[in-house]
């Protein structure tokens, strides 16, 4: 496997945190030593251990001299968790491959700079577009301090949103409905018109889908 393939695996891991990490980003990490994956992890919930620490903790052998693949630049500041760069240095990681640079002003290149200052080989921007897209909501908020808003509108081919009796349940297909549920799981709030509340109040949540 090459750098892109390992990063793609890290992306798959990161997506497991979808809906649980906000306002933090989704992050995945993979530890590779001598061509073998010896550890992997992701940021599972806001306030809990970050992906890098989870990946290092899961290692089946000493990670010293290994390569760490991570979808987002490792943090270098104290928050609810200690800096990930400290864990990387303590583990003796030889090389770090990063997908996205972290736009958070508390990081913003500082994490990578610290790693390089300690002699770690850092490769940047591997699958950057995919890694950036994964956290577009986080990137938007951290750089603008404004909420990321997504609008959903469903209507029939002739422009209707319901039958005149109000008896209609769905006008969208199963694929569209599942997509909406996945989107709801990603967002922290749902805004509707007042007329929707008495009709659909109990349904204004993310329902389970098979995807």
Describe the role of every protein-language-model region:
Residues 27-32, 153:
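Short beta-strand scaffold segments in enzyme catalytic cores
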Residues 10, 28, 75, 115, ...:
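Residue-level signal for inorganic ion chemistry
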Residues 137-192:
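Phosphate/diphosphate-binding glycine-rich loops and adjacent basic-rich segments that engage nucleotide
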Residues 4-20:
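Short, basic/aromatic recognition patches
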Residues 23-26, 148-149:
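Short, small/polar residue-rich loop motifs at catalytic or cofactor-binding pockets
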Residues 202-209:
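Conserved small/polar residues in nucleotide/adenosyl-binding loops
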Residues 31-130:
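Zn2+-dependent cytidine deaminase-like catalytic core
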Residues 100, 194-195:
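Short secondary-structure boundary segments
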């Amino acid at each position: 496997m090459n750098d892109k393939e390992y990063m793609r695996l890290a992306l798959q891991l990161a997506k497991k945190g979808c809906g649980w990490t906000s306002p933090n980003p989704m992050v995945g990490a993979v530890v590779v030593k001598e061509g073998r994956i010896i550890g992997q992890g992701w940021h599972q919930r806001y306030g809990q251990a970050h992906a890098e620490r989870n990946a290092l903790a899961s290692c089946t052998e000493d990670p010293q001299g290994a390569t760490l693949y991570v979808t987002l630049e490792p943090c270098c500041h104290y928050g609810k968790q200690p800096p990930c760069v400290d864990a990387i240095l303590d583990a003796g990681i030889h090389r770090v491959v990063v997908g996205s640079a972290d736009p958070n002003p508390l990081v913003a290149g500082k994490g990578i700079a610290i790693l390089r200052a300690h002699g770690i080989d850092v490769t940047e921007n591997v699958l950057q577009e995919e890694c950036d897209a994964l956290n577009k909501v986080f990137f938007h908020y951290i750089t603008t301090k404004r909420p990321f808003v997504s609008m959903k509108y469903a209507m029939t081919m002739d422009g209707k949103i319901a039958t005149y009796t109000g008896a209609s349940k769905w006008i969208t297909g199963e694929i569209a409905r599942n997509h909406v549920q996945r989107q709801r799981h990603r967002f922290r709030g749902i805004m509707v018109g007042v007329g929707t509340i008495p009709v659909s109040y109990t349904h204004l949540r993310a329902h389970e889908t098979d995807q």
